[in-house]
């Protein structure tokens, strides 16, 4: 189920990556997904059996460009822009072809998700998907 709080945390991480020019589950301040969630007063605790639980957020990251190709003709340049549908399809394909990312998407313990997208000044697209 979509969760707006997770989406806000995900957007914040995507914006942070776009602004500070990094691509990682851990930001330059040393915060991982769970720490960023706690800073936003969001904790995730899921039972995995009658006597144990799992605490923490899951996270998938994806980076792409706004364009798929640049054409140069003399001093002119033009772009083949990626549509939002194309960017969504690219991210999902990449995640589903990666065992760890695929596991996050299909893990039945997670019941909430949020996605955040940011675009950097140099046309990079950062997508963060978070799970609880």
Where do the model's predicted regions map?
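Short, low-complexity, Pro/Ser/Thr/Gly-rich segments in the mature regions of secreted, periplasmic
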Residues: 122-132
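Conserved "HGTGT" condensation-loop signature of ketosynthase/thiolase-family condensing enzymes
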Residues: 22-24
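Generic secondary-structure boundary/loop-capping signal
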Residues: 14, 20, 58-59, 102, ...
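A well-ordered secondary-structure block
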Residues: 33-122
